[in-house]
């Protein structure tokens, strides 16, 4: 559903942010 999709997007952004550090 929408919640799972939003969670996946947030997780992806968090991963990219951590990699950027």
UniProtKB/Swiss-Prot annotation:
Leucine amide PTM sites in chain numbering: 21
GO cellular component annotations of the record: extracellular region
Keyword entries, A-Z: Amidation, Amphibian defense peptide, Antimicrobial, Secreted
Keyword Acetylation among record annotations: no
Location of this chain's protein in the cell: Secreted
Superkingdom of the source species: Eukaryota
Keyword Secreted attributed: yes
Protein's GO biological process: defense response
Tissue/organ expression: Expressed by the skin glands.
Location, primary (coarse class): secreted
Role according to the record: Antimicrobial peptide.
Protein family (similarity comment): Belongs to the gastrin/cholecystokinin family. Magainin subfamily.
Protein name: Peptide PGLa-R4
């Amino acid at each position: 559903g929408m919640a799972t999709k939003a969670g996946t997007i947030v997780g992806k952004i968090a991963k990219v942010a951590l990699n950027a550090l």
